[in-house]
From Swiss-Prot:
The keyword Signal applies. Pfam families: V-set. Disulfide bonds join 44-109. Keywords: Adaptive immunity, Cell membrane, Disulfide bond, Glycoprotein, Immunity, Immunoglobulin domain, Membrane, Receptor, Signal, T cell receptor. Gene3D superfamilies: Immunoglobulins (2.60.40.10). V region of the variable domain of T cell receptor (TR) alpha chain that participates in the antigen recognition. Alpha-beta T cell receptors are antigen specific receptors which are essential to the immune response and are present on the cell surface of T lymphocytes. Recognize peptide-major histocompatibility (MH) (pMH) complexes that are displayed by antigen presenting cells (APC), a prerequisite for efficient T cell adaptive immunity against pathogens. This is T cell receptor alpha variable 20. InterPro entries: Ig-like_dom (IPR007110), Ig-like_dom_sf (IPR036179), Ig-like_fold (IPR013783), Ig_V-set (IPR013106), TCR_variable_domain (IPR051006).
């Protein structure tokens, strides 16, 4: 019997520093349900003047956010276990390869 794995991804963005009228960060999808072992990606699109860094966090229920990655320039990639983060000029992706039940959490992106 296949186990259903629910990974909650919430549309939440954190803007560190001053927010101008044109700065925006959008995370999608809002929620994602995966079967164990089924890979997928989260998208974090941004329009920010003078990006100094993009951050990915993971938050388990009832706990504070846990830092995963910081990306500074387009083309940069970082990997940790089943997670891989990539950055382009306008968006970042968090790829989850072969997720397990313990990967169920809220994943957040933030820009500075």
């Amino acid at each position: 019997m296949e186990k259903m794995l629910e990974c909650a991804f919430i549309v939440l963005w954190l803007q560190l520093g001053w927010l101008s009228g044109e700065d925006q960060v959008t995370q999608s999808p809002e929620a994602l349900r995966l079967q164990e072992g089924e890979s997928s990606s989260l998208n974090c699109s941004y329009t920010v003047s003078g990006l100094r860094g993009l951050f990915w966090y993971r938050q388990d229920p009832g706990k504070g956010p846990e830092f995963l990655f910081t990306l500074y320039s387009a083309g940069e990639e970082k990997e940790k276990e089943r997670l891989k983060a990539t950055l382009t000029k306008k968006e970042s992706f968090l790829h989850i390869t072969a997720p397990k039940p313990e990967d169920s959490a809220t994943y957040l992106c933030a820009v500075q």
